[in-house]
Amino acid sequence: MSYELPNNEKLLKWVEEVAILCEPDRIHWCDGSQEEYDELCELLVQNGTFRKLNPEKRPNSYLAWSDPIDVARVEDRTFICSLSKQDAGPTNNWMNPKEMKEKLLGLFKGCMKGRTMYVIPFSMGPLGSPIAKIGVEITDSPYVVVNMRIMTRMGKKVLDILGEQGEFVPCLHSVGAPLEQGQKDSTWPCNKEKYIVHFPEERSIWSFGSGYGGNALLGKKCLALRIASKQGKDEGWLAEHMLILGVESPTGDKTYVGAAFPSACGKTNFAMLIPPKPLQDKGWKVTTIGDDIAWIKPGPDGQVYAINPEYGYFGVAPGTNVKTNPNAMASCSANTIFTNVALTPDDDVWWEGMTDEPPAQLTDWQGNPWTPDCGRPAAHPNARFTSPASQCPSIDPDWENPKGVPMSAFIFGGRRKDTVPLVYQAFNWSNGVYLAATLGSETTAAAVGAVGNVRRDPFAMLPFCGYHMADYFGHWLQFGRSIPRPPRIFSVNWFRKDANGKFIWPGYGDNMRVLKWIVERVQGKAGAVESPLGWMPRYEDMDWDGLDMPREKFNELTSVDRDVWQNELISHEELFVKLFDRLPKEFLHMRELILSSLWRSPEHWEQIGDVHPEGWNE
């Protein structure tokens, strides 16, 4: 350690208590320097956890392969231990906090024997931002330290801001693998028994047994969503599982938009979107603030402002390539930690979907020889890259603005092969909250459950909301009421299929066409037609330059079928029954309003002809 200990009494006392409990061999206070990062990466190489990649192909980058039992978030081992079970709600796992603490104290007793205890002070959000929060993670994993240096602003500069009296969220992590004297360490220490536990009232996090991703990098989902969502409810702001992007128009106007999608719906691709060439040539441009999490607070001018609390990307590698997301590929071209991807013979990385043809031979994520005909994936489906956000070519110049950026629209979307139209704008804030609360997505191979079933994932926050989901809906309703100029709310669905099971919408860069309409709606420039669900673009309101999209196909993308929507509304009921005791009563009325709107419309609502409003005057 290359600096004096901080003089924050609460922090020093907590570190001392943890050291007595966990019994590490030594304590290292992380300073966040490049030298420290390089030394720890070298230590991980010596331990066999890291392999240094080819410096000509991937400068300053490393590959780690985890234990096969430690490859993803463990939702069934994730607990919200609020004082009252009712406050956790039916969508979270709960255990009495007193019982849980006793259990954890038993597990953590002596769990760091033979290891170094690292103290990581970190800031979620730009240093000194009024929206930012400070956390301190104690861990026995150097893998966690180096990932946290990419994912957060960390080290001595954070302690300087914390000062003597500053508040912080204590985050305690251990892989749960103590070493007896002379015992050889494993390349990926972890424990079969795993607990990821949040104590919302005392704002603390305990994680045991896993060294992987969101289970171990406690600033990410644990602090930035589960603890922060509860803090936001108490203090009047929002912590959301949401990307933030900026849209620059040909006139130079900048509009910031947040978008929430469940997993496997293309969130990172959308955050780093590159417009189609005809729209680029007209001067349209997209910039990235963040790809995963947004903290949103009301500003003094009546608008809402958002920051990306993270400092890097923890992206899913499989499926990412230069066609689908060139910005993500550029982001992980150097200074990156790869986890559970495959290794090429020349010490570079590969994963499914990276190239059209796989290499003739690889070493797979479990260290075994791999060939294209061996019948198993080379990279784990949840393989990741950890890359600095500053390396993203589309990064917005204001991505570290401590005030945040002003938000004009929120977009919610899932993966639906039918039912939900390409895009529509909610009639008002409450209607928008309802559409986000009933967000559904068909399960893919990435999620547990039968493929094709619709899983309700309200606001894409189901695994990440740190308190009762119905109270969360109420908080959103109240948040909008308290703002003079709330953002507009939109629904999108890129995944609608035709009768032959083919996607109707091209997606990827062409999503810019929908985004352009959304931005122009917010600015009061774009037309729309009233549908039973909300305001929808007419064919002529969209920019089709460079895309062959017949009117009939567009009508198919935007049609609303009464029978299908009646079934959809019945399935909303399942969620509402689960949350009934605290569900905002407006929701039941809103459901009736949508039903009434469907019955007052044609059985199969579809856009017709080339009708312009001025045509009515003839």
Swiss-Prot record:
Amino acids binding Mn(2+): K221, H241, D292
Biased composition (Polar residues): 384-393
Binding site for substrate: R73, Y212, G213, G214, S263, N382, A383, R384
Summary of subunit composition and partner proteins: Monomer.
Entries under HAMAP family matching the protein: PEPCK_GTP
Name this polypeptide is given: Phosphoenolpyruvate carboxykinase [GTP]
Any matching Pfam family: PEPCK_GTP
Cofactor stoichiometry and binding remark: Binds 1 Mn(2+) ion per subunit.
Pathway annotation from the record: Carbohydrate biosynthesis; gluconeogenesis
Cofactor(s) for this UniProt protein: Mn(2+)
E.C. designation(s): 4.1.1.32
GO cellular component: cytosol
Positions with a binding annotation for GTP: A264, C265, G266, K267, T268, N269, R384, R415, Y508, G509, D510, N511
Keyword line: Cytoplasm, Decarboxylase, Gluconeogenesis, GTP-binding, Lyase, Manganese, Metal-binding, Nucleotide-binding
UniProt entry tagged with the keyword Cytoplasm: yes
Biological classification of the source: Bacteria, Pseudomonadati, Thermodesulfobacteriota, Desulfuromonadia, Geobacterales
Function: Catalyzes the conversion of oxaloacetate (OAA) to phosphoenolpyruvate (PEP), the rate-limiting step in the metabolic pathway that produces glucose from lactate and other precursors derived from the citric acid cycle.
Gene name linked to the record: pckG
Matches recorded under InterPro entries: PEP_carboxykin_GTP_CS, PEP_carboxykinase_C, PEP_carboxykinase_GTP, PEP_carboxykinase_GTP_C, PEP_carboxykinase_GTP_N, PEP_carboxykinase_N
Recorded family membership: Belongs to the phosphoenolpyruvate carboxykinase [GTP] family.
GO biological-process terms attached to the record: cellular response to glucose stimulus; gluconeogenesis; glycerol biosynthetic process from pyruvate; oxaloacetate metabolic process; propionate catabolic process; response to lipid; response to starvation
UniProt entry tagged with the keyword DNA-binding: no
UniProt subcellular location: Cytoplasm
Gene3D superfamilies membership: 3.90.228.20, Phosphoenolpyruvate Carboxykinase, domain 1, Phosphoenolpyruvate Carboxykinase, domain 2
Active-site residues per Swiss-Prot or TrEMBL entry: C265
Catalysed reaction equations from the record: oxaloacetate + GTP = phosphoenolpyruvate + GDP + CO2
Molecular-function annotations in GO: GTP binding; manganese ion binding; phosphoenolpyruvate carboxykinase (GTP) activity
Region of interest (Disordered), residue spans: 375-397
